[in-house]
């Protein structure tokens, strides 16, 4: 049975499990984890009664589990997912959603070479900050695409960890470690905050988008058993500090460990990020013992209001974390959804919010919860 504190369920959507949910202009975009389900589009003008208005599919062998929408455009990813349809190819689908009930494919942008496609990205209505595979590189890199002409996207710039560009003559130093993989960038101003899976996170200066340059990075290597999923910049100072929230994902552990958690960095001097705090769901790690995957942190909402950040915490649902005091982040609410029928536990995978403060929590296996909070 669902459990709640400072939250209340508004409505529940029965839909295939998904990887990302995004709200734009009373429309909810839900990207699904497994083919043939691609993207579902809902009218949520009345959040108590969401209505399915469109649905896209993808061929077996690929999934389209990420979605963003802005300025009448919807961008979805195409990434390899098991075997099948090699001719389909990885990349991005760019759609006209000026009428959300009638999404129209404008262009399919394909990655170079025979790589796996695009994983996750940021999109501001013009530029897409993506994590594609690319010919000549080992693992996903960071790339900026200009979609001013959505029928003809143009690459603006790219960045990678030195050593990834083996076709360019770089020495590859990770034969005995996990290969580099850009998970996704997030833009704030002229900076990109880039998560890089088992290779930490990086801050890039993109004042000149054609030449992204490294400001700093933190890579704990094998000292951190969990991959880094998100590097989320807080928009204003907190107690005089510039703050970056870093979420590690509770999967792909390098060795048995307690559940993954979130870290807080002071980036007031962005050339020297300093970890100043951590957050774990209270009671989840009582003794430091190793636990199965997908019990701990997955990711924060990339949209939020004030200092309360909604997190998707896999089996432990939605956690509302207040970082007003960045030295002591604290939980101020939660919503733990019912376990989807046929599964052993919930798997809250993604979360976003709308301008009215409603929270949209998407399960990896099945279902989406629309939740309200009394935290303002």
Language model feature labels by segment:
Residues 1-376:
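Feature marking well-ordered beta-strand scaffolds used for ligand recognition
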């Amino acid at each position: 049975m669902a459990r709640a504190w400072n939250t209340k369920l508004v409505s529940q959507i029965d839909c295939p499990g998904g990887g990302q949910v995004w709200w734009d202009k009373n429309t909810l975009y839900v990207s699904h984890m497994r083919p043939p389900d691609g993207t579902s589009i809902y009218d949520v003008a009345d959040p108590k009664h969401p209505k399915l208005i469109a649905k896209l599919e993808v061929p077996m062998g690929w999934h389209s589990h990420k979605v963003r929408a802005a300025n009448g455009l919807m961008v979805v990813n195409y990434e390899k997912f098991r075997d099948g349809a090699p001719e389909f190819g990885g990349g991005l689908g760019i759609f006209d959603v000026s009428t959300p009930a009638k999404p129209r494919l404008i262009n399919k942008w394909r990655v170079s070479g025979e790589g796996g496609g695009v994983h996750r990205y940021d999109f501001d209505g013009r530029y897409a900050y993506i994590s594609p595979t690319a010919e000549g590189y080992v693992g996903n890199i960071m790339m900026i695409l200009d979609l001013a002409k959505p029928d003809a996207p143009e690459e603006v710039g790219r960045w990678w960890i030195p050593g990834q560009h083996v076709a360019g003559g770089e020495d590859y130093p990770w034969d005995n470690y996990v290969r580099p993989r850009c998970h996704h960038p997030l833009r704030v101003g002229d900076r990109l905050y880039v998560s890089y899976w088992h290779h930490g996170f990086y801050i890039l200066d993109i004042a000149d988008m054609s030449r992204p340059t490294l400001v700093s990075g933190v890579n704990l290597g094998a000292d951190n058993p969990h991959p880094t999923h998100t590097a989320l910049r807080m928009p204003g100072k907190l107690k005089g500090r510039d703050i970056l929230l870093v979420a590690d994902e509770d999967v792909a552990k390098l060795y048995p460990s307690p559940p993954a958690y979130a870290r807080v960095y002071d980036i007031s001097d962005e050339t020297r990020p300093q970890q100043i705090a951590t957050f774990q769901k209270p009671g989840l790690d009582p003794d430091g013992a190793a636990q199965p995957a997908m019990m701990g942190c997955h990711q924060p909402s990339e949209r939020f209001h004030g200092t309360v950040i909604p997190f998707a915490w896999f089996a432990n649902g939605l956690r509302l974390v207040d970082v007003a005091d960045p030295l002591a982040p604290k939980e101020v609410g939660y919503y733990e959804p019912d376990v989807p029928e046929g599964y052993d536990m919930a798997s809250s995978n993604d979360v976003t919010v709308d301008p009215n403060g409603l929270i949209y929590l998407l399960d990896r296996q099945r279902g989406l919860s629309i939740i309200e909070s009394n935290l303002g």
